[in-house]
């Protein structure tokens, strides 16, 4: 795109300076071309003079003057150059160059915005990984959309993405689930029962227990083993979770079974390997991981005195199995409640001889629902918390997905139900999707009137000179970079805000200028722009899993 053209131009300018002795070659590749932070500072800005000044020990504005003079000669691309502040060089691009963006959009078509920056790099994204002990909560929902959106953006930048759900079906919480189900089963058949003090509440447990009554009657009344109850509950809850994920448009390439870590001896082998390295000791009938030797503040229990592993041990074993599958990049998406265990797990990975720098852990904050500015708790039959399914029933899949991406992962997310259900321009989802519907409507109207968009390369495109038109072309030009930046930063919120800015610019243009006018040539030029905007916005919505409605 235009930024890369400008970077090539700047590289030539730099090399000319090296060749004629203006500066040394030590600054090669160290300068950047960025969008300016404020309006009125050109279309792009470069720090080349500041970088060279630090290396050459010279005045940055003097060097900026040399750069500006060289760039000013490139009149086919550059319309103007200005030195700003301590030595930034601000560059304004010729309008005709912006018109060339339209050719790039139509040439790439549905692939416009996608790039090869990932170069086929193998990436595993682990997300959701909720225990099969109940329906997905709104907190799980945020993680599900965050993980899926990151995976989609990485795929759009040519990363080979593998989505995995770590299926936590071992340990204490599963036993408690079985005990809770058995208690409800006994209650339903009129037998004596004692509900676990920390048991799982909610109607869903009663529903599972009822299915056992329907299938077995009272035959399980004296069953001493909790396994039949646990297995029935696990199957029912996994089916429920799978249905919720399907509603959200999320699929996984693999569900990794935690129980397999025990059955295949991976837990024991990790303990033995750490023991062989002198990193494990016994104290108070528990097994400790000596993480202080690895730079942590204190040692951690990995096997309790009861013989039950803590979360850290299976997590270390699971990450070892991830590394064995030869991914180039491992991305873990967890709730912020994992913050204490992450350093210990990564220390364990390093201790086992793996490169923990290949692991990126993204922690997200929690979600609160609000109505009329106050936190609310929706009434729920299924559980003692709000489920994702219930939220989808209220706001729909697109709104759910969009709102979950609005904020940085590490920011608390306030989900405003009033805003989410309103059909007004205050609702960001409506605002963006309505922009697409408007674009489609304009194209449909032009078709009915027999007005054909100008062809790419036509001199008619020179009619696109309004400031709002040039601004839209600049935004189109930034579409691939918006995808790439959001993908590599693991930051879907950045792309969402790009789409909101895109929609805002179009709505402003639509309100100020008629696309179809009495001037046929101007109408054709503007329709070419509208066509490119529609295709690009459609691509953007589809890349992050949103629909692009043609009418609203």
UniProtKB/Swiss-Prot annotation:
* Catalytic reaction(s) noted: tRNA(Arg) + L-arginine + ATP = L-arginyl-tRNA(Arg) + AMP + diphosphate
- Output a single Gene Ontology CC term carried by this record: cytoplasm
* Location(s), subcellular: Cytoplasm
Its keywords, alphabetically, are: Aminoacyl-tRNA synthetase, ATP-binding, Cytoplasm, Ligase, Nucleotide-binding, Protein biosynthesis
GO process annotations (BP): arginyl-tRNA aminoacylation
**The protein's enzyme class:** ligase
Q: Which GO terms describe its molecular function?
A: arginine-tRNA ligase activity; ATP binding
- Does this entry carry the keyword Zinc? no
Q: What is its main location?
A: cytoplasm
NCBIfam families found in the cross-reference section: argS (TIGR00456)
Matches recorded under PANTHER family: ARGININE--TRNA LIGASE, CYTOPLASMIC (PTHR11956:SF5), ARGINYL-TRNA SYNTHETASE (PTHR11956)
Q: What protein name does the entry list? A: Arginine--tRNA ligase
Q: Which gene encodes it?
A: argS
